[in-house]
C-alpha cells in the first residue's frame, strides 16, 4: 500500500511538472527576460532589535551588542559612563533588503533581520533606525519597525518546545528609500534583454518576435540575439522608450529549455522535465537493510557480597535484502519513463540512485542537476 501511494505521488508530481511545461511553453517576454539596466541591488546594514522579553543577547558573550547600545545611547545624548548593563532585551542583527530597479525616494521595502549574537528569539522586538547601504557604500534606505517572526520557542525548567526559526524575521514595509539609483534608461538608445534561463532557441525566437512587431510599427528590424542570454533592442528615432518597452514585454514567444532532471538528495525531491528521454536499458534494484539493536542486561551481585552492579552487553544484528526486480526502461515519453520507474516499486531515494546510474551508463539523454 505504501509503495502504491509512493508511486502515485511520483506520477502525479512528474505529470504535473509536464503539464506546467506544456501550458507555459508560450510566455510573455516580461516573464522570461528582464532589462540589463533594470536589475535589483542588494542592501545591508547593522542594527539593534529592542523590546525582547529576556531573549536577546547576553552582553558578556556578545560584546559588540554592548558597544552598540552604548554608542546608540550616546548619539541620543545619554551618558553611559560608569554603568554596567546586564539587560537581555536587546539583540544585534544584520538587516538586508533588495532595492528594485527604478525605485524612487519615499517608496517602501520589506527588510529581513537575522541575529548576530546568542539571542534565542526576536519575537516581539522592534528594529530601531538602521541605515542600509549598497556595494558602493552609499546609504539608499533607512529601516525601522516591528519584527515579525514565524517560529516560536517556549521552555520551562525541564522541557523545551520550538518550531521554525526564531532568530530571524521580517519587517514588512520597514524601509524607506532615501536615494534613487542612477539609471540611464531614459537616455539610452540600445537596451539589452537578459533571459532568466539562457537558451539560444528562446533568444532567437524573442528577437524574431520583436522584429515582427517592429516591422509592423516602424517598418524595420530593431532586435538581434547576441548570445544564449542577451537580446539587443535598438530604439527607433521617433519611438518613446517607455511605450516601446511596454509593447515589447507583452509580446508572446515560444520558450524552450534543455532536457533536465533535478534531484535534491536532502529532501528526496525529483523533478523530471518533459523532454527527458532514456535509451533502452535494464535496471535491477535491491535494498539491504541492516538493523543493530542493543539490549544490555543488568547483573546484580549476591546479597552481602562485595560485588558491584554491572551490565552485560547484548547485541542483535539483523540483515534483510529486498527487491531484485529487473525492469526494462525505454523512455520514449515522460509517461513511459515514469511507468517504468514505478514498475520496480522503489521509493524516491531509490529512484535517485537509479537515475544517477542510468546517467553514468550513458542512457539518460538529459542534464542531471544535483542539489
Curated annotation (Swiss-Prot):
<dbReference type="InterPro" id="IPR001782">
    <property type="entry name" value="Flag_FlgI"/>
</dbReference>
<comment type="subunit">
    <text>The basal body constitutes a major portion of the flagellar organelle and consists of four rings (L,P,S, and M) mounted on a central rod.</text>
</comment>
<dbReference type="GO" id="GO:0009428">
    <property type="term" value="C:bacterial-type flagellum basal body, distal rod, P ring"/>
</dbReference>
<comment type="function">
    <text>Assembles around the rod to form the L-ring and probably protects the motor/basal body from shearing forces during rotation.</text>
</comment>
<dbReference type="GO" id="GO:0005198">
    <property type="term" value="F:structural molecule activity"/>
</dbReference>
<dbReference type="GO" id="GO:0071973">
    <property type="term" value="P:bacterial-type flagellum-dependent cell motility"/>
</dbReference>
<protein>
    <recommendedName>
        <fullName>Flagellar P-ring protein</fullName>
    </recommendedName>
</protein>
<keyword id="KW-0732">Signal</keyword>
<feature type="signal peptide">
    <location>
        <begin position="1"/>
        <end position="25"/>
    </location>
</feature>
<comment type="similarity">
    <text>Belongs to the FlgI family.</text>
</comment>
<dbReference type="Pfam" id="PF02119">
    <property type="entry name" value="FlgI"/>
</dbReference>
<keyword id="KW-0975">Bacterial flagellum</keyword>
<keyword id="KW-0574">Periplasm</keyword>
<dbReference type="GO" id="GO:0030288">
    <property type="term" value="C:outer membrane-bounded periplasmic space"/>
</dbReference>
Amino acid at each position: 500500500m505504501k509503495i502504491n501511494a509512493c508511486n502515485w505521488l511520483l506520477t502525479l508530481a512528474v505529470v504535473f511538472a509536464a503539464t506546467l511545461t506544456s501550458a507555459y511553453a508560450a510566455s510573455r517576454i516580461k516573464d522570461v527576460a528582464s532589462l540589463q539596466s533594470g536589475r535589483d541591488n542588494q542592501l545591508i546594514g547593522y542594527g539593534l532589535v529592542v523590546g525582547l522579553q529576556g531573549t536577546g543577547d547576553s552582553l558578556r558573550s556578545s560584546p559588540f551588542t554592548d558597544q552598540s547600545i552604548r554608542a546608540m545611547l550616546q548619539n541620543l545624548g545619554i551618558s553611559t559612563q560608569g554603568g554596567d548593563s546586564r539587560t537581555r532585551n536587546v539583540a544585534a542583527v544584520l538587516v538586508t533588503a533588495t532595492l528594485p530597479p527604478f525605485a524612487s525616494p519615499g517608496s517602501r521595502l520589506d527588510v529581513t533581520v537575522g541575529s548576530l549574537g546568542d539571542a534565542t528569539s526576536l519575537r516581539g522586538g522592534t528594529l530601531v533606525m538602521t541605515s542600509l547601504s549598497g556595494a558602493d557604500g552609499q546609504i539608499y534606505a533607512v529601516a525601522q519597525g516591528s519584527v515579525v517572526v514565524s517560529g516560536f520557542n517556549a521552555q520551562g525548567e525541564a522541557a523545551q518546545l520550538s518550531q521554525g526559526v526564531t532568530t530571524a524575521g521580517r519587517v514588512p514595509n520597514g524601509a524607506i528609500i532615501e536615494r534613487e539609483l542612477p539609471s540611464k534608461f531614459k537616455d539610452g538608445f540600445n537596451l539589452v534583454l537578459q533571459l532568466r534561463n539562457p537558451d539560444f532557441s528562446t533568444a532567437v525566437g524573442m528577437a524574431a518576435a520583436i522584429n515582427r512587431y517592429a516591422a509592423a510599427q516602424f517598418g524595420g528590424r530593431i532586435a538581434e540575439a547576441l548570445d544564449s542570454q542577451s537580446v539587443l533592442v535598438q530604439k527607433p528615432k521617433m519611438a518613446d522608450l517607455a511605450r516601446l518597452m511596454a509593447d515589447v514585454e507583452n509580446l508572446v514567444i515560444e520558450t524552450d529549455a534543455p532536457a533536465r532532471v533535478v534531484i535534491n538528495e536532502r529532501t528526496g525531491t525529483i523533478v523530471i522535465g518533459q523532454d527527458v528521454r532514456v535509451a533502452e536499458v535494464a535496471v535491477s534494484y535491491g535494498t539491504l537493510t541492516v538493523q543493530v539493536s542493543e539490549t544490555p542486561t543488568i547483573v546484580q551481585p549476591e546479597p552481602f557480597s562485595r560485588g558491584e552492579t554491572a551490565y552485560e552487553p547484548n547485541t542483535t544484528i539483523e540483515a534483510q535484502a529486498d527487491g531484485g526486480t529487473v525492469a526494462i526502461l525505454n523512455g520514449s515519453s515522460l509517461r513511459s519513463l515514469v511507468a517504468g520507474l514505478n514498475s520496480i516499486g522503489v521509493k524516491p531515494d531509490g529512484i535517485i540512485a537509479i537515475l544517477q546510474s542510468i546517467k553514468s551508463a550513458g542512457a539518460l539523454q538529459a542534464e542531471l542537476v544535483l542539489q
